[in-house]
Amino acid sequence: MNSSNVITKIALIGGGPSALYVCKNLISSASTNIELHIFEKSDTLGAGMPYSIIGANDEHITNVSDNEIPELLSPIHDWVKEAPLELLNHFNIDPTTFNEYKVLPRLFFGRYLSAQFEKVIALAKTKGIAVHVYLNHKVVDIEDVQTRNEVIVSTEEDKKRTFNRCIICTGHYWPKTLEGNIPNYYDSPYPPSKLERTFNHPVAIRGSSLTAIDVIRTLAAAHGRFEKNDTGEVCYIRSETFEDFRMVLHSRNGLLPAVRIHLEESQASRQKKKKTDHVLENRKTNNGFLSLDFVFEMAFKDAIKEKDPDFYARIQHKTMEDFVQLMMRYRLRLN
């Protein structure tokens, strides 16, 4: 038998974002002698845990924007033009004013990923690649049979299937250790539906990263509302029913997640050509590499000098290490 005609059966364990990108890349490759089998324990492909109701409510947002997402078959700013109207209305998204540099509601992003998965599977069919999807199938065991170069996948209903290859795309997993044993203790805030309750006492949050922000958004929505005051600042108004409610973050470093901004110009300085000679000279003296101190001076501080002379005066004589210490002290003070 011609080896080029042999079909390689590939199992994908998990049908979330990782599986989506694996399928997209496999199907977009030159090889068509593959057969894909996708096992997903939920009833939806694409969204996974972070972008479905298992890991998000309406108030939760992504930590990436459209312009940062690795390429799929169509970008979000195109997909919003064909997205269901009820979905757009639900999240108050207008396709005509969609901004690809802004973060998105996670559940909205999950719907996009699911739609992209459908397109990837449709593309596979046009190439003659079979894709089998097993929704609501929980994989409980994977056996590597090295003597036969096979992998046996067992699902919860005690069904065994044999494949040539197996790719693990299981994504997030939140083990339970103390949850259920200690009253009112949660090992993680997921699914967020378990936090959709009210408290009239302080709530401790261990950590101050993006996961903590998810908790804050969920609890804030349940215990009050956000409004703009007379000066246009957004303020949180706690419900009078829960006057003793408050959130207390416990953090090892005392820092909240860094604020993300979008620069209208991807490069702070446009003076590339006249600096080329300096770059080449620095590489000559550093075995082909650029000195970090050189990059800090030329690519960062020189641009600051051009854009913000007053701030440049503060950092003009500081090394990269000095600058980091200055900024960290400033950030700690703000936090």
Label each residue range with its predicted role.
Residues 135-149:
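A conserved short coil-to-beta-strand element within the FAD-binding core of flavoproteins
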Residues 1-6:
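Basic/polar N-terminal segments that are highly enriched at the extreme N-terminus
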Residues 120-133, 242-244:
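A short helix-to-beta-strand connector/capping loop
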